[in-house]
Amino acid sequence: MALMGVQLVVSLLAVSIMQRMAPHLSFARWLLCNGSLLKFRHPSEGELCALAGKQIPKTSRRDRRQNGHGESKPLTVPKDIDLHLESTPVNVMDALVLRFFVEYQWLIDFAVYATGIYLFTEGYYSVVDASKEVNIASIWCVLTVLFCLRTLYLLMSHYFLSEEGGERSVCLAFGFLSLLIAMLVLVVREDYLEFGLEPGFTSLFDNFEVFARKQGYEWSVPFTKLSVKLGLAVICAFIGALLAFPGLRLAQTHLDAVQMNADRPMIQILLHMSFLSPLVIIVMWIKPIARDFLGNAPMGKTSVTLLSSSAFSSVRLWTIVVLCVLRLLLTRYHLQAYLNLAQKWVEQMKKEAGRIAAIDIQRKVTRIFCYLTVVTLQYLIPILLVLFSTLALKSLGDFSWGLGAETPGVTPAPIIPSSTPPPVPGPEDDEDMEDMEEDIQATVAHLTELFSALRALLTPIFFRGIFAFLTWWVAACQLISSLFGIYFHQYLMHN
């Protein structure tokens, strides 16, 4: 039986630390409350009246009786008043009232601990021969991907529950567009898009056919392949709908961040590289452009091998990780660009004629800050999806970080509960304990057979195809939605 050993101990220790330290030490809370982000405080009615050159109206009892319900008329001020919002650093007390703050803190902290577990596991496998142990890091990576999708679903459900139907229509439109694109991508041959889905499905179906025949079942492989691809296309449509608003928001914060750093050309270059990083990820899975070109680069009348096949796979993994780290390092610029929307809205209001209620100004400025964690999740989750899909691809797909010859990786071993000696029974319950031992042995034998069958079905070839396609698809969805967002904010918003 395979034991988790050191990995299980470290994993349980990480879970315990995460649970106990969350109220005291949280990376997610530090990201928003380290003093680098500045929020804008909404003006009070007294400040607005002073800028408008009048006093705060006092309502008499007679006016309240005439209004019927004791409500005073809303205070209005001219839109072109000389209003300048006061900025203050975001602190912990401010962050506690933000929308989806609990979900944000839990997800980001879990991703940080998952990264630590992954780094420990990689170091552990480089020192110890742990081929018979379960790769706990891959489980953490898969869980992080699932939790990211769950959080995006919570955000999207918020749009569907709102009274306005515009956000719901956008999600549905991107979902149907993603469904069409996914069906087109899934019929492209492996000679052009080298996900490895076909070899992965072939391995899965062949192994499952052997398993089904042993159980006495007959099934049709062509029908199963078609149904699996249709199901995968539906999942792609769902992911595309989830990534619609994160891409649109990324486009807006990118444009504002570039404008905000107009006097810092190096930051602008990094922002543009970060924005175009999904395009680089997409190109790296196009075989004629990436692998074939680097494997047989034309040099006059001859061709030169710049990278071997295994070295290219490692370079691709490293490139994706570096691009994700770059985008994570630029998080603060995007978040500050979003917070600056409050001052940007005030400047736009000054150009308009007429009057506006003071409560509307206060509500608009406050609403921008209240959705800071939503915008942070929309920026970070696509990055985490790509990053942890790539890490899972490396671990479960038996890839290597080195540029030399590809070494066989670690295939997840079946998780089998270890049997511990039962306590010594008394004379009165010998028969009950014997029956219990027989039940436990039967359960262990059944689980052993089940996990052995799953290990034979889910091979590294299958995991390579699934996680390579997931990584590529998330990057493609974000590129499509963000480019549409650039077009929307640059042209449609000004017309």
Swiss-Prot record:
Glycosylated residue positions: 34
Main location: membrane
Signal peptide limits: 1-28
Coiled coil region boundaries: none
Subcellular location(s) of the protein: Membrane
Membrane topology, record value: Multi-pass membrane protein
CC terms in the record's Gene Ontology section: membrane
Keywords: Glycoprotein, Membrane, Signal, Transmembrane, Transmembrane helix
Cytoplasmic side: 121-135, 189-227, 287-305, 389-465
Extracellular membrane side: 29-99, 157-167, 249-265, 327-367, 487-495
Role according to the record: May play a role in protection against oxidative stress.
Family: Belongs to the TMEM161 family.
PANTHER family: RE42071P, TRANSMEMBRANE PROTEIN 161A
UniProt name for this protein: Transmembrane protein 161A
Species annotation: Danio rerio
Gene this chain is encoded by: tmem161a
